[in-house]
Amino acid sequence: MPNMSLKKNPMPSQDPIVRSKNFLEVATGYTKEMAVDEAKRCLVCKNPRCMTGCPVKINIPTFISLVAEEKFEEAYQVIIKSSSLPAVCGRVCPQESQCEGLCVRGVKGESVAIGRLERFVADWHNEHAVLPTAKPESNGHKVAVVGSGPAGLTCAGDLAKLGYDVTIFEALHLAGGVLVYGIPEFRLPKSIVQKEIDGLVALGVKVETNMVIGRSITINELIKEYGFEAVFIGSGAGLPKFMNIPGENLIGVYSANEFLTRINLMKAYKPDSTTPIKLSKNVAVVGGGNVAMDAARCALRLGAEHVYIVYRRGMEELPARKEEVEHAEEEGIIFKTLTNPTEILGDETGTVCGMKCVEMELGEPDASGRRRPVVKPNSELVLDVDCVIMSLGTSPNPLIKATTEGLDTESWGGIIVDEAGLTSVEGVYAGGDAVTGTATVSLAMGAGKTAAAGIDEYIKNKK
């Protein structure tokens, strides 16, 4: 029987007071009964708008219909045809601005909880599936993938399903890219990422860690000396941006990238860590995206008494996912919106002791269509903080550009590609943050999927 409730089933979660002191996953996931009930809210539209909002084009109505019938493994098989990372996507994709944002049920009520259902199905499969993954028959062609983030994993998975011999080259000691070094355990457990990677390995994908492409091996060497017929660059965007204001070199100033990498990958909060993070009482995180929310919530879990999100626009302009903002508010993060830093203050030891700011007000729209923040006269203030984390986005590392002859990039470092993901170098494709700069996991996955199709077509035409 259809469920015509205007509200989606709420996601069970840890209590905010409890979770703000641990790194366990905040959202605990739907039960079977909740998932089936939520799936019955889907109208199974003849022209499903939700699918047009999905970067990897999952057949959403079909998988949800199968959930409603309690055919969870069949639902998983529908999802996995389009997405190599369903357990990841169900947790971190911005569904409210993609598939769920176009759901018809959202016109007069809340949209169907597509992301939560995708997560449920993937988790159910990981817990209950008994049949081993069938390894596709090899087609005899080799492809290299640079980077093991969402773009690289998706490209590798799609190519492996087509029979390609795929090797992923990862610079760090763990595979997963931003999924493991950038997103905290409480939002995306590392065990979930590892299970997704294990699934790709079962398809025949090889993963080589501690391989810095551009240093260990160049792109040209992969093709000319190692026999790869095509290369996909999905190396992400790990070069942090700063404001270039006075005081950014003080002790206690971090990029969000460094702060999160130390916590997520190196466990820098442990007393015996070789890359320790100074525990702070009052922390300011500059920025308003998902990464800023992650950094702020990590600082809180490390024992900070006050954590501020400092953002130059208003609450309604925050680019972070609605759920992440709500979780941060529930945990006690303080939002200082319409506020912009002008200087970081230091004491006699060169350590952060405050941050000068000015209040902002919204003026006329800028090129992005959002109202441009302008300084409010005579509005200077000082925040009493001993740590500042800059979360202002990232750009691609220039190493691959510098070591790949003929590779064209934008002035800010993004690799230039065509609609198939092809770069200016024959047989070399790229996608994800290495092309766009900081973007979402799902958009990176979509780019990896596009490039995989382009690589397949390229190699077929070479035969």
Where is each model-derived feature located?
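Ferredoxin-type iron-sulfur electron-transfer modules in oxidoreductases and energy-metabolism complexes
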Residues: 19-37, 59-91, 108-135, 263-264
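Local cysteine-cluster metal-coordination motifs and their immediate loop/turn environment
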Residues: 40-59, 84-107
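Feature captures the FAD/FMN-dependent oxidoreductase FAD-binding
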Residues: 74, 137, 142-146, 194-245, ...
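Glycine-rich dinucleotide-binding loop and its adjacent helix/turn
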Residues: 121-137, 195-215, 240-302, 409-424
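N-terminal Rossmann-like FAD-binding beta1-loop-alpha1 element of flavoenzymes
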Residues: 141-167, 292-300
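Rossmann-like dinucleotide-binding cores of NAD(P)H-dependent redox enzymes
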Residues: 165-168, 172-202, 207, 296-343, ...
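FAD-site-proximal beta/loop scaffold in flavoenzymes
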Residues: 249-280, 365-438
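A conserved FAD-binding loop/helix module that cradles the flavin
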Residues: 434-462
